């Protein structure tokens, strides 16, 4: 679970695609998380599958690719990052799960 308050921005430094998932490597200054931690990446809950000094990797399933804009993410893109909420953390935003159920289409913007 997340608060929706962006903690950092990361940059996608590498993308690998297969027929089962898309793997992204993100350069970031996030600290104090482990492999297996949930990281909110531009509103999408992803799991850190690898971790290096200032980088981590997350795999995006085909279902998540279909239901989110992550299908358009490419090397060099910046994404918003937030580590998962821990008991005792301040909740200054609102509760966000990061699990996408469906997508909508913006039909009109009025100014």
Positions of predicted regions on the chain:
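Conserved loop->alpha-helix
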Residues: 1-111
């Amino acid at each position: 679970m997340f608060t929706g308050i962006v903690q950092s921005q990361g940059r996608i430094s590498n993308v690998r695609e297969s027929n089962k998932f898309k793997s992204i490597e993100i350069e970031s200054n996030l600290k104090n998380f482990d492999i297996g931690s949930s990281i909110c990446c531009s509103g999408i809950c992803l799991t850190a599958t690898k971790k290096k000094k200032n980088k981590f990797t997350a795999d995006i399933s085909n279902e998540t690719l279909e239901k989110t804009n992550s299908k358009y993410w490419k090397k060099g893109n910046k994404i918003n990052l937030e580590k998962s909420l821990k008991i005792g953390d301040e909740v200054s935003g609102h509760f966000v799960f990061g699990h996408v159920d469906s997508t909508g289409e913006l039909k009109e913007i009025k100014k």
